[in-house]
Curated annotation (Swiss-Prot):
CDD domains reported for this sequence: neurotoxins_LC_scorpion (cd23106)
Alphabetical list of Pfam families matching this protein: Toxin_3
Lineage: Eukaryota, Metazoa, Ecdysozoa, Arthropoda, Chelicerata
Name used for this protein in its record: Beta-toxin Cn5
Organism field: Centruroides noxius (Mexican scorpion)
Presence of the UniProt keyword Disulfide bond in the record: yes
Record-stated family: Belongs to the long (4 C-C) scorpion toxin superfamily. Sodium channel inhibitor family. Beta subfamily.
Localization (cell): Secreted
Domain remark in the UniProt entry: Has the structural arrangement of an alpha-helix connected to antiparallel beta-sheets by disulfide bonds (CS-alpha/beta).
């Protein structure tokens, strides 16, 4: 029983350590989600935890929403072959 518990705990930690992180990106413009209040930011946290993003935590870093615990399928900035176009 203890072995099963240890294996489960290790798998959980591996998943947490290897989770993707990065700036949230707007797929249509290729730009980062912007923010002004650096550090703990309710807007960034909400965006990161949204169903379509799947992150575990978000905050404002260098005026962009940085997310942790993202699934590999969630795109992050910069997008390949797409530069930020502010139109």
């Amino acid at each position: 029983m203890n072995s099963l518990l240890m294996i489960t705990a290790c798998l959980f930690l591996i998943g947490t350590v290897w989770a993707k992180e990065g700036y949230l990106v707007n797929k249509s413009t290729g730009c980062k989600y912007g923010c002004l209040l650096l550090g703990k930011n309710e807007g960034c946290d909400k965006e990161c935890k949204a169903k379509n993003q799947g992150g575990s935590y978000g905050y404002c870093y260098a005026f962009g929403c940085w997310c942790e615990g993202l699934p590999e399928s969630t795109p992050t900035y910069p997008l390949p072959n797409k530069s930020c176009s502010k139109k």
